[in-house]
């Protein structure tokens, strides 16, 4: 599948109390192309159960599920994987998951990390944070100039993450970003209907003018 559009990322604190599945389905209805399941808890049984449910939803809507920092879970479910800089070897994950799996890599604000990820078999790279982020407030800041440098040198999809809103996403897309990864601006909503509305608005940014 082509990696372009809204990249929705779950947050276990935002999506507690039974909101995970209805809110995720709303995001998928609204056009999210990728969904990253991000849960750092140690409850493996619950994580497996939730990931299986999310995989079913993604299959229903033609989207791709990506698991954060758990190559074994990704391999068990036959889904994609996202690795941070401290989450283990990308090349080892590629060997485990196979050539066809989508594997993304966090590259913060450093082009050399992205080039290394490409060499190790990444499917996409993620730069950020571009704006103030409540999820990762201490992450290194990335600039739009980084995108200008990266676009001609990286021949694979580029993801932007970090405090992105409907107001700031267009400028990043104009600089060549293929995927905008969104957490709070999508899921910090009072209802599933509002999540769907926001997802449709983000997805519309990728449509030809």
Swiss-Prot record:
One of its GO terms (cellular component) is cytoplasm. It comes from the Bacteria. Pathway: Cofactor biosynthesis; thiamine diphosphate biosynthesis; thiamine phosphate from 4-amino-2-methyl-5-diphosphomethylpyrimidine and 4-methyl-5-(2-phosphoethyl)-thiazole: step 1/1. Its cofactor is Mg(2+). SUPFAM superfamilies: Thiamin phosphate synthase. Signal peptide: none annotated. One of its GO terms (biological process) is thiamine diphosphate biosynthetic process. It holds the Pfam family TMP-TENI. It catalyses: 2-[(2R,5Z)-2-carboxy-4-methylthiazol-5(2H)-ylidene]ethyl phosphate + 4-amino-2-methyl-5-(diphosphooxymethyl)pyrimidine + 2 H(+) = thiamine phosphate + CO2 + diphosphate; 2-(2-carboxy-4-methylthiazol-5-yl)ethyl phosphate + 4-amino-2-methyl-5-(diphosphooxymethyl)pyrimidine + 2 H(+) = thiamine phosphate + CO2 + diphosphate; 4-methyl-5-(2-phosphooxyethyl)-thiazole + 4-amino-2-methyl-5-(diphosphooxymethyl)pyrimidine + H(+) = thiamine phosphate + diphosphate. The keyword Metal-binding applies. InterPro entries: Aldolase_TIM (IPR013785), ThiamineP_synth_sf (IPR036206), ThiamineP_synth_TenI (IPR022998), TMP_synthase (IPR034291). 2-[(2R,5Z)-2-carboxy-4-methylthiazol-5(2H)-ylidene]ethyl phosphate binds at residues 133-135, 163. Its EC number is 2.5.1.3. Mg(2+) binds at residues 69, 87. One of its GO terms (molecular function) is magnesium ion binding. Keywords: Magnesium, Metal-binding, Thiamine biosynthesis, Transferase. 4-amino-2-methyl-5-(diphosphooxymethyl)pyrimidine binds at residues 36-40, 68, 106, 136. The keyword Transferase applies. Binds 1 Mg(2+) ion per subunit. PANTHER family: THIAMINE-PHOSPHATE PYROPHOSPHORYLASE, THIAMINE-PHOSPHATE SYNTHASE. Belongs to the thiamine-phosphate synthase family. Condenses 4-methyl-5-(beta-hydroxyethyl)thiazole monophosphate (THZ-P) and 2-methyl-4-amino-5-hydroxymethyl pyrimidine pyrophosphate (HMP-PP) to form thiamine monophosphate (TMP). This is Thiamine-phosphate synthase. It comes from Pseudomonas aeruginosa (strain UCBPP-PA14). The gene is thiE.
């Amino acid at each position: 599948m082509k990696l372009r559009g809204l990249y929705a990322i779950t947050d276990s604190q935002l999506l507690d109390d039974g909101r995970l599945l209805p809110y995720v389905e709303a995001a998928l209805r609204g056009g999210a192309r990728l969904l990253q399941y991000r849960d750092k808890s140690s409850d493996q049984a619950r994580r497996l159960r939730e990931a299986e449910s999310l995989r079913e939803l993604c299959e229903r809507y033609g989207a791709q599920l990506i698991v954060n920092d758990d190559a074994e879970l990704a391999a068990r479910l036959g889904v994609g994987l996202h690795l941070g800089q401290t989450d283990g070897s990308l090349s080892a994950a590629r060997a485990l998951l196979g050539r066809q799996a989508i594997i993304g890599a966090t590259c913060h604000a450093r082009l050399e990390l992205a080039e290394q990820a490409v060499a190790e078999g990444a499917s996409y790279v993620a730069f950020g944070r571009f704006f103030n982020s409540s999820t990762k407030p201490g992450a290194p800041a990335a600039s739009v100039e980084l995108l200008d440098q990266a676009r001609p040198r990286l021949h694979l999809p580029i993801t932007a993450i970090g405090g992105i809103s409907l107001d700031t996403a267009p400028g990043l897309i104009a600089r060549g970003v293929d995927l905008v990864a969104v957490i709070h601006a999508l899921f910090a909503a009072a209802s599933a209907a509002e999540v769907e509305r926001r997802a449709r608005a983000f997805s519309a940014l990728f449509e030809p003018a």
